[in-house]
């Protein structure tokens, strides 16, 4: 099993690489790529960690050696948010980066499962899809927007509020991966009751959690460490499913059969080909129904921007 981390010298990429070096199954190959010349050094540093995962780093303009033979590609390349920016401000730089990487993937490893971390995910996933479609290699089962950060934040904040162990909390998060498009389904959290005020406050906090970190870092970056953990959780789930484990379910932003938008985050069952089944997100509360209706114009607008950009 070969996993490639693209954008591996950045804050998310280094955190993700560290976690994968420690947690990938024995015998896995981990390839790191970044345009930054430090990347082979990041791999050298990580190679000293005594786990049965081989690691190589590649720098420069061409990601081909990292992508060759990859089963899973995790893309975190791009610029990070600074105070005052929202995820849409990142579009101007990051859209071009994702487009050129998708063009490479289409040639070098068209059968790989590709997880996109690079924001704005609502828009970068449709860009990658359009590029892969043009190249005639698109398989909607193998392209994911990684929204797991919204899930782990939801689990953490619910556990904090209710005095629970976070590992016992499961919160499906649907929609997209920015602002109002993030919808945690708090009505579905088992064994926990919320007041209407708690639901509203928690939902807002989960939606604005990225900004919370950007402001707390005071210009020194965005959510890199928690995003590394989230991407690792999703990446490992994908690896387990590709290796034949049954019943692996995570939320992800995929092109499914959603009635709401061409791309939509919801629980997906993972299997040997990527997405085995897009699962129903179940019954919504009145608050959640209203929030879903209220986000769709924004989400569909984000998707259209990506489709137009890739034309």
Curated annotation (Swiss-Prot):
- Please give the subunit comment from the record: Homodimer.
Q: What is this protein called?
A: Malate dehydrogenase
Catalysis: reaction(s)? (S)-malate + NAD(+) = oxaloacetate + NADH + H(+)
Q: Which HAMAP family match?
A: Malate_dehydrog_1
Alphabetically, the GO molecular function entries are: L-malate dehydrogenase (NAD+) activity
Which key words tag this protein in UniProt?
NAD, Oxidoreductase, Tricarboxylic acid cycle
Uppermost EC category:
oxidoreductase
Q: Which residues bind NAD(+)?
A: 7-13, 34, 94, 117-119, 227
Family annotation (Gene3D superfamilies): Lactate dehydrogenase/glycoside hydrolase, family 4, C-terminal, NAD(P)-binding Rossmann-like Domain
Q: Which Pfam families match?
A: Ldh_1_C, Ldh_1_N
InterPro entries in UniProt: L-lactate/malate_DH (IPR001557), Lactate/malate_DH_C (IPR022383), Lactate/malate_DH_N (IPR001236), Lactate_DH/Glyco_Ohase_4_C (IPR015955), Malate_DH_AS (IPR001252), Malate_DH_type1 (IPR010097), Malate_DH_type1_bac (IPR023958), NAD(P)-bd_dom_sf (IPR036291)
NCBIfam families in the record = MDH_euk_gproteo
Keyword match Transmembrane helix: no
Its family remark reads: Belongs to the LDH/MDH superfamily. MDH type 1 family.
Active site (record annotation): 177
Q: What organism is listed for this UniProt entry?
A: Vibrio parahaemolyticus serotype O3:K6 (strain RIMD 2210633)
Protein purpose: Catalyzes the reversible oxidation of malate to oxaloacetate.
**GO aspect biological process, one term:** malate metabolic process
Which positions bind substrate? Answer: 81, 87, 119, 153
EC identifiers of the protein = 1.1.1.37
Gene Ontology, cellular component aspect: cytoplasm
What SUPFAM superfamilies would the database entry show? LDH C-terminal domain-like (SSF56327), NAD(P)-binding Rossmann-fold domains (SSF51735)
């Amino acid at each position: 099993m070969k996993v490639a981390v693209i954008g591996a010298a950045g804050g998310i990429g280094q955190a993700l690489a560290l976690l994968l070096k420690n947690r990938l199954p024995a015998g896995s190959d981990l390839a790191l790529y970044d345009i930054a010349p430090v990347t082979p050094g990041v791999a050298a540093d990580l190679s000293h960690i005594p786990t049965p995962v081989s690691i190589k780093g590649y720098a420069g303009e061409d990601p081909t050696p990292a992508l060759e033979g990859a089963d899973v590609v995790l893309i975190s390349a791009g610029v990070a948010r600074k105070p005052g920016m929202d995820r849409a401000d990142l579009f101007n730089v990051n859209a071009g980066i994702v487009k050129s990487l998708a063009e490479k993937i289409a040639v070098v490893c068209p059968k790989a499962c590709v997880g996109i971390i690079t924001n704005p995910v609502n828009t970068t996933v449709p860009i990658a899809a359009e590029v892969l479609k043009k190249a005639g290699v698109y398989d909607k089962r193998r392209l994911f927007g990684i929204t797991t950060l919204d899930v782990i934040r939801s689990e953490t904040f619910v556990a904090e509020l209710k005095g629970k162990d976070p590992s016992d909390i499961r919160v499906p998060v649907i929609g997209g991966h920015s602002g109002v498009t993030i919808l945690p389904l708090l009505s579905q959290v088992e064994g926990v009751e919320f007041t209407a005020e708690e639901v509203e406050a928690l939902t807002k906090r989960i939606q604005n959690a990225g900004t919370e970190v950007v402001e707390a870092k005071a210009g020194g970056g965005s959510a890199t460490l928690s995003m590394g953990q989230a991407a690792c959780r999703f990446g490992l789930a994908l690896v387990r499913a590709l290796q034949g484990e049954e019943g692996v379910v995570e939320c992800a932003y995929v092109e499914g059969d959603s009635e709401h938008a061409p791309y939509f985050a919801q629980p997906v069952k993972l299997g040997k080909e990527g997405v085995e089944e897009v699962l129903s997100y179940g019954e919504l509360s009145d608050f959640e129904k209203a929030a879903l209706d209220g986000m769709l114009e924004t989400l569909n607008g984000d998707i259209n921007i990506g489709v137009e950009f890739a034309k």
